[in-house]
């Protein structure tokens, strides 16, 4: 409100969005919110439409090109503009934003800026240039989980010299934490069934793969569990939005999902979180369990662990970055073009990455960011004669550095699972905090009265949800695809 740059770290569910919504409503000008989470953008837009009507818009992949062009013509009429960091690389959008009075520039999930953060996004590193190009508005950087090193990196990356920091403990004392060890996958499935049948819902079960979300949903339905659906990033946008709404309206008591679910679902009465697979780092774990108990009521987070789990997070980490052989293959493809031309448009390089080298979007972002940093990509063109073996080896070395950091974070996660002390204390210590006082329900090492989380009322379990059936009802279709 006073025009000062701020970095704020607040626990999940403690009103981070209110930190920019309230000032945005009280001040003149437009609030520009950068978020990497498409579902969260859509959720925020839906909520704000109740307050500012049609003066809110999200620029992301959910919008068609025509919709984006139409919205750009009236940017100044919007009170809140949500945008992905990738969209801010559009010269056309930046040109239009320069014409708008941006009173507040919000960086949501700001830990994505730091290469040492658990969810580093290269395009976040370019936000300092965007801020300068649109007139250096006041900056608000928000995160729920960041170490002191990451907070420092956020300030430096955004060029915030005299920044005010509001940093609160990441502890959620109303969420008890438990780890349950099993020997086999079958035992784990049975343990999941027992927990789902025992615990008061609504609940969320996290898995590390799309296939497992579908497999477990089918398993639970086969055991008589109703009001359950799966959710993952491979589903169509309409399908995902339907499931979110059914969960929000308590028509679904349980969602079996990947990490794609949750950030866009601001549901206050989620009572339990179960991890069927553990995430690759502690910060992700805190984010995910933080979706329980946002109303302050007692909730529980349970992690199921078997000896067969430990290879999965390693493969997830390795899939996040291009391998040495993939980088070498890409360079060979690009160097072949040197005999035809001196430079390639960025669009053609992107096409080679996706189609010939079989890169995914994450790999392409990584390659593009580092080639831009090294000056190999300039003014949206790749200088082919600069693609030396030295440059290739620097990219490979950067991957190795990133992998070592991720493996270290994974070891911290595994240590927490096996720890022989207070789980809450161990988690807080990773972020430089201490547990304050004793809790009735803390963790399985200290004490948990499990009956506090037992089903206390008949839940709406006769609603056997099927998203295909719901889509048919909405669109009046007899069969999907007609």
Positions of PLM-derived features:
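Helicase motor core with emphasis on the C-terminal RecA-like subdomain
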Residues: 1-19, 23-34, 39-327, 377-380, ...
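C-terminal helicase lobe
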Residues: 200-203, 222-233, 245-252, 257, ...
């Amino acid at each position: 409100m006073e025009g000062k740059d701020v970095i704020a770290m607040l626990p999940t569910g403690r009103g981070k969005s209110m930190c920019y919504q309230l000032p945005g409503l009280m001040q003149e000008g437009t609030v520009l919110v950068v978020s990497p989470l498409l579902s969260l953008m859509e959720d925020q837009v839906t909520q704000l439409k109740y307050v500012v009507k049609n003066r809110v818009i999200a620029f992301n992949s959910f919008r068609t090109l025509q919709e984006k062009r139409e919205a750009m013509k009236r940017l100044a009429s919007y009170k809140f503009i949500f945008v992905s960091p990738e969209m801010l690389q559009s010269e056309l959008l930046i040109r239009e934003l320069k014409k708008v009075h941006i009173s507040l520039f919000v960086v949501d999930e700001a830990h994505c800026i730091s290469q040492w953060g658990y969810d580093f996004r290269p395009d976040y590193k370019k936000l300092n240039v965007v801020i300068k190009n649109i007139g250096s508005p006041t900056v608000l950087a928000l995160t729920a989980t960041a170490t002191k090193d990451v907070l420092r990196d956020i300030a430096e990356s955004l060029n915030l010299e005299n920044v005010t920091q509001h940093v609160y403990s990441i502890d959620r004392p109303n969420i008890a934490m438990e780890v349950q060890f099993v020997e086999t996958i079958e035992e784990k499935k049975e343990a999941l069934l027992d927990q789902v049948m025992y615990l008061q819902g609504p609940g969320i079960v996290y898995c590390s793969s799309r296939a497992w979300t579908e497999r477990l949903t089918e398993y639970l339905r086969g055991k008589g569990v109703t009001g359950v659906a799966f959710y993952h990033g491979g589903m169509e946008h309409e399908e995902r939005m339907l499931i979110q709404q059914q969960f929000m309206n308590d028509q679904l008591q349980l969602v079996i999902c990947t990490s794609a679910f949750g950030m866009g679902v601001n549901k206050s009465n989620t009572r339990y979180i179960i991890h069927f697979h553990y995430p690759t780092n502690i910060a992700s774990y805190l984010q995910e369990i933080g979706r329980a108990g946002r109303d302050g009521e007692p909730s529980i987070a349970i992690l199921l662990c078997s000896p067969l789990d430990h290879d999965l997070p390693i493969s997830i980490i390795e899939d996040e970055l291009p391998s040495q052989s993939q980088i070498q293959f890409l360079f060979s493809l690009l160097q072949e073009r040197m005999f035809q031309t001196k430079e390639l448009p960025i669009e053609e390089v992107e096409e080679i990455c996706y189609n010939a080298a079989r890169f995914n979007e994450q790999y392409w972002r990584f390659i593009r960011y580092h080639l831009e940093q090294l000056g190999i990509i300039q003014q949206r063109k790749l200088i082919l004669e600069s693609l030396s073996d030295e440059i290739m080896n620097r990219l490979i070395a950067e991957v190795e550095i990133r992998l070592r950091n991720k493996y270290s974070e994974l070891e911290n996660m595994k240590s927490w699972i096996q720890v022989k002390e207070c789980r809450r204390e161990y988690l807080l210590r990773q972020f430089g905090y201490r547990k304050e006082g004793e809790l009735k329900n803390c963790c399985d090492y200290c004490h948990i009265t499990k009956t506090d989380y037992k089903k206390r009322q008949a839940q709406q379990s006769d609603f056997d949800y099927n998203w295909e059936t719901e889509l048919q009802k909405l669109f009046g279709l007899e069969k999907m695809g007609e």
